[in-house]
Amino acid sequence: PTARVTLTPKYDTICDGDNIGVTLTSPSTPTRQVRFRYTVEKPASVTVTPAGPENNLTPGTVLTNQIDNPTDSAQLVRFIVTPYTRNPGDDGEKCTGTNDTVYVWVEPTAAVSVSPGNDTICDGDNVAILLSSPTESTRQVRFRYTHIPVAGVTVTPGAGNNLAPGYTITDQI
């Protein structure tokens, strides 16, 4: 039969510096066990370790490549996996099967930019700190903050959660 590959998961989103976890299996049953090889397609700025190509991988192999995305945008990395049958008596490729692709979005490390409206305020005044981010991820960046208590200073409310870019912190001090 023509060798086929099953990839689990086929689509994934990971954080910068994380490892993938893709299992290679095959429903095909040739006379000798199917083997797999893969190549990687990635943007130039992204690093994949190991970078591939790799071959002679057995069914049940889990790809655990680490992917580093130093940019401020989500990047798509593709792993093209090809199954094949082997020559009798060695592990050389005999018949190439039907390849399939794993699609991995690699999120950037989120960054925050804060812009205070004033650098000096009076007791009882409100701050005006604008939150923004250069990060372009697959989903909108969100922020949370807390203040570090200082003796004799009260900050109200002093914390925030699930804040979108463009939000202005207006705590009273």
Regions found by a protein language model. Give the residues of each.
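Extracellular low-complexity Ser/Thr/Asn/Gly-rich intrinsically disordered segments
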Residues: 1-173
